[in-house]
Swiss-Prot record:
Transmembrane segments: none
Organism: Geobacter sulfurreducens (strain ATCC 51573 / DSM 12127 / PCA)
Name of the gene encoding the protein in the UniProt record: cbiD
A GO molecular-function descriptor: cobalt-precorrin-5B C1-methyltransferase activity
Family named by the database record: Belongs to the CbiD family.
Superkingdom as given in the UniProt entry: Bacteria
PANTHER family referenced in this protein's UniProt entry, alphabetically: COBALT-PRECORRIN-5B C(1)-METHYLTRANSFERASE
Enzyme class: transferase
Associated pathway: Cofactor biosynthesis; adenosylcobalamin biosynthesis; cob(II)yrinate a,c-diamide from sirohydrochlorin (anaerobic route): step 6/10
GO biological process assignments: anaerobic cobalamin biosynthetic process; methylation
Record-given protein name: Cobalt-precorrin-5B C(1)-methyltransferase
Known catalytic reactions: Co-precorrin-5B + S-adenosyl-L-methionine = Co-precorrin-6A + S-adenosyl-L-homocysteine
Keyword field: Cobalamin biosynthesis, Methyltransferase, S-adenosyl-L-methionine, Transferase
EC identifiers of the protein: 2.1.1.195
Amino acid sequence: MSGRELRHGYTTGACAAAAAAGAARMLRRQELADEAEIVLPRGERVAFRLHGQEFTETWATCHVVKDAGDDPDVTNGAEIHATVRREALNRPGARTMVFVTGGRGVGTITKPGLAVPVGEPAINPVPMRMITEAVKAEFSVVCLPQILTVTVSIPNGEELAKKTLNARLGIVGGLSILGTTGIVRPISAKAWTDTLDAAIDVALACGCRTLVLSTGRTSELVVQGALAGEHLREEACVMMGDHVGYALRACARKGAEQAVLAGQFAKLLKIACGHEQTHVSSSELDLRLLAEWIAATPAASHLASLVEGANTARQVLEASGNDPALMELVCSRAREAARLLAPSLRIKVLLAGYDSTVLYFG
């Protein structure tokens, strides 16, 4: 690899949790706070600088300026605000409750198929949990039960959302509060391909002839668990991200014998559709092609109606009840698409469920 190592950043979810933690701290202690520390989903402790701090006896507010590191993220520099309000809960046996809602610049879900129900603010489950836990932790030492309401807002979120695919997905009025790890990894193409080359070289040098190419950290963890009994070496796991075509060709060029493609349904469907680059800026998922495949496959014909009204690939999979015919159809086509990109490689495909289980491997 050449050049400096790219700097990682933090997700909107991590920033929202930090802002909520800071506001909760000021509200409870009735004093200004300059920073707030939160625990990310994988256990890392990170401190965020706070801005715009205000508090009274009943509410407090502040914001965190999102730093996406060297990732070309449209939300880089955005102000992620959180306001925490409290009211006493005068009921015998009551416990403190935390409610999280979206304010100005946070979108609302209007179509099914996403991780958040229709009508709810576009705050994904992991950030929602991070925000709730951060506020609960601050008030855990308070004996008097209270109702704590957290409002997350992004002042220019509606304008920024126009630069994303949110509207197409049915997220209206603003941005989504996202993140599963709290950390944004840079997606610079040169950085990724340099990293891929180095990782593949290391794996082969360690004697690995089967390499696991994952689209993200979640699918990587799933495949590591699934293949734990096969003495899978850590070096064999290569996070290819969205660079499917490059990773497969590099494996073949460098002498690997087999590759296991590991990803969730939407990513594998993109691979099946022939996309060598699966990032949203480079590839659009057209469910009409999936509908054509289903129509041409007798074993999957019962799934046709599910695709007609679907908004996302995830919605199709979940509505099918993880139907084996659907998974076989998409995974087999992903496998064939991968073979076209790297004919010398033996290819297997692992479909990681949205609940981190193995849905298909073959």
